[in-house]
Amino acid sequence: MSLLDYFRSNKKQNTAQLAKERLQIIVAHERSSRGGPDYLPQLKQDLLDVIRKYVQIDPDKITVQLDKKSDELSVLELNITFADDKKG
């Protein structure tokens, strides 16, 4: 009977290890698909608030992207499409 218990407990360990590895893959995928650090949405909102003090902008016309170029260099890119003020 102890021989069967040995195989059963080993199978549970393997199942637990497999579940842990799958969960780590899912978490890593979710982190990479977010596209940026946790502070990026708040940074975007703060930048919008400051820019709105000076010009009228549409929040849907703004993109904020953080690109990691190397271990020491990240580039924050902010693109704003301003409304055309021309009347006519």
Curated annotation (Swiss-Prot):
One Pfam family it belongs to: MinE
Gene3D superfamilies for the chain: Cell division topological specificity factor MinE
UniProt key word Cell division: yes
GO annotation (BP), single: cell division
Record carries keyword Cell division: yes
Record keywords, A-Z: Cell cycle, Cell division
Superkingdom in the source lineage: Bacteria
NCBIfam families: minE, PRK00296.1
Function in brief: Prevents the cell division inhibition by proteins MinC and MinD at internal division sites while permitting inhibition at polar sites. This ensures cell division at the proper site by restricting the formation of a division septum at the midpoint of the long axis of the cell.
Family under the similarity heading: Belongs to the MinE family.
Protein name listed in UniProt: Cell division topological specificity factor
